[in-house]
Amino acid sequence: MKTRNPIVVQRKNGPPRFLHVNFNQDQECFSCATEKGFEIYNTDPIQCSVKRRFSHNGMSGIGYTRMLYRTNYIGLVGGGASPRFSTNKIAIWDDIQQRDSVSIRFNSPVHELFLSRQYIVVVLAQSIDVYTFSGSPSRVCPVISNIHNGIADFVTCSKMRRASGPQDVEHALSQKHVIAGILAYPSGIRPGQIHIADLSNIQTPSVADASATHLPTSIIKAHKNPIHLVKLSPQGTMVATCSVEGTLIRVFSIASGSLIHEFRRGLDRALIYDMQWNGKGDKLAVVSDKFTLHIFQINEDLDKRHLLKGWFPKVKYLQGVWSMCSTKLDRSLLTHDEDTCKVGWIGDEALSLLWQKSGMWEKYVIMEKLREYKVDETLHSGAPDGRRQLYDLVRESWRQL
């Protein structure tokens, strides 16, 4: 006689648990959009900290959420069967006042929303609008047009800027800290190109008119195929890109536009679900519809190159740098066949995965091990005594939310 109930009820392709999930800026917590409102969880240990339910004339659905660190402000966009807000409107929800303190309406649906203490960045299908973060938002610069498919990323970081002054040389060479708002987006005119803009470089004429301002941008030729994802490092110094092919991940320097790393995820075409930098900006996590999670190391020789590299003429498969570690994800626990996930870092040696439709949280830990080198494995250049450091990705825990 069966007396034990299963931990997870397998309901394939039922109603989605969440309509959207998003990590906050430091990845210490995440927000989830639902048909009834939104929820906020601490990443590790996993715990629900906020749960809001709307009941305004039966209109309660939230389709997108974006937190502002751990503050009381949360960006919301309507969604689901009965949207609480229009899909072409953003609402900045004040959780202390229990009301939306700011709302801005657009002519087309909102694809992405980024918040900082200085800016509100709204990404539409083919354009980006930037406003000041205030009770009465004002436009910072003219509308950025000709972007591709509502794809963009935005980070804020501190940087040094040389101050200029007519008084003396010492003052002219002095430096000051400024808050830079780095914006990256693919070109809608030239597939494969991305544009980088720093909002702190906005050139404003004497006339107080946002339409007269100018935002300088730099261009990086990243891929031959259309861009699928761009992800800026937390320090605003590098940008990771992938195309619709999903086989190569490229990392570029924002300052020079030069290629720093080219990583190979695999040979078969794949849909990249998400890419995420760790806090130090020296590791990049990539998860795809092949149900694999890859970790790439930046500026270190910990990634793997193929055993036959250097023995045969240049072949793209052999030349690529592979991940320092990877793992195959267990799809048996998912309650939806076609689910997508977001990845976030817990410190520098652990990660969390959020499965949107299934409402499942997973924690993976990077474990290092030392073992004898085998012929059928990849080589590590400069490994002493035929031994090399290897890393594994191990699932430590999971939970149905």
Swiss-Prot record:
What does the record list as GO biological process? Answer: autophagy of mitochondrion; glycophagy; nucleophagy; pexophagy; piecemeal microautophagy of the nucleus; protein localization to phagophore assembly site; protein transport
* InterPro entries documented for this protein: PROPPIN, WD40/YVTN_repeat-like_dom_sf, WD40_repeat_dom_sf, WD40_rpt
Bilayer topology annotation: Peripheral membrane protein
Annotated WD repeats reside at 222-262, 267-306
Q: Which UniProt keywords apply?
A: Cytoplasmic vesicle, Membrane, Protein transport, Repeat, Transport, Vacuole, WD repeat
Q: Which one Pfam family would you cite for this protein? A: PROPPIN
Query: Is Repeat one of the keywords UniProt gives this record?
Result: yes
Summarize the protein's role.
Involved in mitochondrial or peroxisomal functions and amino acid signaling pathways.
Q: Tell me the protein family, please.
A: Belongs to the WD repeat PROPPIN family.
What does the entry note on its domains? May contain a beta-propeller domain involved in specific binding to phosphatidylinositol 3,5-bisphosphate (PIP2), leading to the association of the protein to the membrane.
Protein name per the record = SVP1-like protein 2
Species: Eremothecium gossypii (strain ATCC 10895 / CBS 109.51 / FGSC 9923 / NRRL Y-1056) (Yeast)
Q: What is the lineage of its organism?
A: Eukaryota, Fungi, Dikarya, Ascomycota, Saccharomycotina
Q: Which gene encodes it?
A: HSV2
